[in-house]
C-alpha cells in the first residue's frame, strides 16, 4: 500500500520521519507537563568538547583568528564620552572552509551521520548552513540535498539566497528551491522519508554543541593574548543556535562575559508573506526569526530545539538595515576586510555598545561570514531599489522596514536599540502555556521555565498568574 503523500498525510508522520532521520527519540527527554530535560538532550551528542574540537580540526574547521579592529575602535571613540570606547574585536569565522561559523555545526552533524551509516544528509536552510553541510558532506563522501525558501510567487529570488544556492551547488549539493510558504517543511519531510538521509538540522544537539567550540576558543584566545576574558560578546541572532552554542562554550571555559544578541530590525514585515518576502535586504540575523525563536524555540524542524537563546542572553539589541550596510562599508574601507551581512549585524551593534564601555574593556563580535555576488552591499541595495524601497542618507531611526533603507549621515548615528528582556521572558512563558494548554504545572515545570527565561521562581509564578488572570 502506497503512503499518503498529501500535505496532511506527510505531516501526520512527521515525528516518525524525524526519529528515523536523526536517530533521536525526543520523547525520552520529556519530563513534566511542558518541560523536558534539556541537558540530557544535549548530552545525547555523545561527544565531549575535546572530541568535537578533534572532529572539527580534522576538516579545517575552527581555530579561526581573532582580529582587533583598531581603526573602527578609534572611530567609535570619536563619538564616545571621555574615557569610553571599548576595544572592538572580531573572530574571523569566514576563515572556515565554507565561509562561516556554521561549518562548526555542520562538521559535527555530518560526522555523526556518517558514523551512524547514513548515505546522505539533508538540511532546510536559506544558505550559509547549507554551504557548510555541503562542504562537510563533500569531505565525508556523503550525498547532500539542501532545501531553500528562495522565491516569491512571481519567481523572483532574493539575491543573497540565490548566491548561497550557487555556493551549495558548487560544493556538490543538490539544491531544491521553493517559493515562500508552508511547502518548505512538507518538501523537507518528504525528501527525508524518500531518501532515508540524515536530518542535518540547524537545531539538533549535534549542531548546537558544535558551536560550543567557538565560545570556548574565544575565552582561551583572549586569556592567552590579553590576560582576560572578553567583557562583552555580541552574537548575531536569528534561530538562536549561534548565541546558544557560543554562550555554552564560554560557560564551559569558565568565562563570565556578558552575552548580547543582535538582530536587524524588520518589524512590520512578515517572514511568510509572499508580497513582503523581497521587501527585506537581510535573509538571516533579523527580528523575523530572532524574536519568534527566542520566545518559543520549539517551532523548528525538530520536536525540541537545542537552540534556546533566552537561557543565555543577557541583553537583546536591534540595529536597522541601513546601519548594517554602513558598518559593512566601514569595515572594508577602514580595516580592509570585506565580510557578509550576518556578522556585520553584530558589528553594527558592537560599534554602538563599545561607546558605552570603558576604554580598557573588550567587546567581541564572535563571527564573520564570507561575502560575494548576491550577499554584497551593491546587489542588495539594487534589489531593494527594484522592489520600490527608498534608499537615502539620513537618520536611521526613521527607517521603516519594507519602505526605506536609511544610511546614517555619520557613524555617530549608529545606535543599537535595547529590547525589554522581561517582555521577551513573559512572551516565552505565554507561548509555553499556549502550546501546552492542558499542562498541570508542577515544580519541574516551574524550574524549567526559570531556566528557559534566565529568571527566578518569583518572576515565573507572577507571570503565570498574570497570564491566567
Swiss-Prot record:
Transmembrane segments: none annotated. Pyridoxal 5'-phosphate binds at residues 128, 238-242. Its EC number is 2.3.1.263. Its cofactor is pyridoxal 5'-phosphate. It catalyses: D-alanine + acetyl-CoA = (2R)-2-amino-4-oxopentanoate + CoA. It is an enzyme of class 2 (transferase). GO terms for biological process: ornithine metabolic process. Keywords: Pyridoxal phosphate, Transferase. The modification N6-(pyridoxal phosphate)lysine is found at residue 102. Completely inhibited by p-chloromercuribenzoate (p-ClHgBzO) and acetyl-CoA, and partially inhibited by N-ethylmaleimide. GO terms for molecular function: transferase activity. The keyword Transit peptide does not apply. Belongs to the threonine synthase family. Involved in the ornithine fermentation pathway. Catalyzes the thiolytic cleavage of 2-amino-4-ketopentanoate (AKP) with coenzyme A (CoA) to form acetyl-CoA and alanine. It is strictly specific for AKP. Heterodimer with OrtA. This is 2-amino-4-ketopentanoate thiolase beta subunit. It comes from Acetoanaerobium sticklandii (strain ATCC 12662 / DSM 519 / JCM 1433 / CCUG 9281 / NCIMB 10654 / HF).
